[in-house]
Swiss-Prot record:
The gene is tsf. This is Elongation factor Ts. The keyword Cell cycle does not apply. It is found in: Cytoplasm. Its main location: cytoplasm. PROSITE patterns: EF_TS_1 (PS01126). Belongs to the EF-Ts family. GO terms for molecular function: translation elongation factor activity. Associates with the EF-Tu.GDP complex and induces the exchange of GDP to GTP. It remains bound to the aminoacyl-tRNA.EF-Tu.GTP complex up to the GTP hydrolysis stage on the ribosome.
Length: 212
C-alpha cells in the first residue's frame, strides 16, 4: 500500500472538494490509490456535488461583513434549497466566510463564465503583446496566453480564487464541500463590495450558480 502522505490527501481534496479527514479515510480504504479514492468518496456521496448543482436554490441568506473600522463592507446573497439548511451553522458559516473572502480578495465576477467578452479579449491582447515583447515565439503565443488567462481568472473570479482562510482550496471547492456535507445545492447569487472613497465599488452583477 502506498504511504498516505499529506500531499496525496491534498491532491484528492483538490480533485473532489471533500474534507481532509474524509480524503485521508478514503485513501486508506483505497490503499493509497488516488483514482480509487475518488471512487470511494463518490460511493459515500461526498464527491457528488456536481449532481446536486443543477437543483433549484430558492432559499438562503444575505450575509454581510464589515472590516477596517467601517471603511470596507460586503453584502453577499448565498442560496440553498431549503430554509432548514439556511438555518444551519454550517451554511451560516459559509455565507460569513464568503463575505469575508470577498472583502479581502476583491473579486469582480462570480465565475469565469460571467467575464464579459470585451474584458477577455482586452486581457488576451495584453498577454500576447507582453509575450511578444519578451521574445516568445509567435507559434507559442496562444498557449502562453491561455496559461496567463488562467491566472487572470484566479485573480478576478470569486469561485476560482484561493480561499483566504485555506489557500489549498478555491472558493468553488469550499462551496462543493458544503454541498456534499449538507446534501443540497448551494449557489452564490450576487455580491457587492463597498469601500469608503470608492464611488463605484464592486458588483458581481449577476445571479450565477456557484458549482456545477
Amino acid at each position: 500500500m502506498a504511504e498516505i502522505t499529506a500531499s496525496l490527501v491534498k491532491q484528492l481534496r483538490e480533485r473532489t472538494g471533500a474534507g481532509m479527514m474524509e480524503c485521508k479515510s478514503a485513501l486508506v480504504e483505497a490503499k493509497g490509490d488516488l483514482t480509487e479514492g475518488e471512487v470511494v468518496l463518490r460511493k459515500r456521496g461526498i464527491a457528488s456535488a456536481g449532481k446536486k448543482a443543477s437543483r433549484a436554490t430558492k432559499q438562503g441568506l444575505i450575509g454581510t461583513y464589515i472590516h477596517h473600522g467601517g471603511q470596507l463592507g460586503v453584502m453577499v446573497e448565498v442560496n440553498c434549497e431549503s430554509d432548514f439548511v439556511a438555518r444551519t451553522d454550517d451554511f451560516q458559516e459559509l455565507v460569513h466566510d464568503i463575505a469575508m473572502h470577498i472583502a479581502a480578495a476583491d473579486p469582480k465576477f462570480i465565475r469565469k463564465e460571467d467575464v464579459t467578452e470585451d474584458v477577455i479579449e482586452k486581457e488576451k491582447d495584453i498577454h500576447k503583446a507582453r509575450a511578444l515583447a519578451e521574445g516568445k515565439p509567435e507559434k507559442m503565443l496562444d498557449k502562453i496566453t491561455e496559461g496567463r488567462m488562467s491566472k487572470f481568472y484566479e485573480e478576478i473570479c470569486l469561485l476560482e480564487q484561493p480561499f483566504v482562510k485555506e489557500a489549498t482550496l478555491t472558493v468553488g471547492q469550499l462551496v462543493k464541500t458544503k454541498i456534499a456535507k449538507l446534501g443540497e445545492n448551494i449557489s452564490v447569487a450576487r455580491f457587492v463590495r463597498f469601500k469608503v472613497g470608492d464611488a463605484q465599488g464592486s458588483d458581481s452583477g449577476s445571479e450565477t450558480p456557484a458549482a456545477e
